[in-house]
Amino acid sequence: MMNIQDNYFYIPELKYNQDELYNSYLNNDRDWARYGNQDHNSLHTKYVDTKEVEHIINQFKRPEIIDNVKFFKTMANGVVDPHSDNRNVAINIPIRTNDSQNTIFYESKGDYDNPDINLGDKKIITNAKRYNKVEETQRFVLNQPACLNTSLP
């Protein structure tokens, strides 16, 4: 089993205003991309103009390494299948969550497929992996900013 530091760490010193981010989320008119074929078990993403979150990005020692910022959502009563992508890490900043929503890490016990990204009528091939057989290794509540190891399912 992996050490907790291998999967994620909280970033409590990161300062942001949840209401401002939520308003930015509501007013963002870009299209949602869906990683997968069905709404209820897919991750939905939308790019954010980095100028809107510059005050957050500039809190990092090397803000130039941040190459994109996205909003993520899951559908009400939905789940996101175990997955990984081509990034090494992601910084997740919760805007609207509750303490019953867990982020879970897994160990792959079998094969995976590569879900398409669905953006409107377009399908985009991705290197993301959706795992078919997994074993849970860690669970935590994402109720504050955290850096996640996104190379793990």
Regions of interest found by a model, annotated:
Residues 144-153:
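Terminal, low-complexity interaction segments
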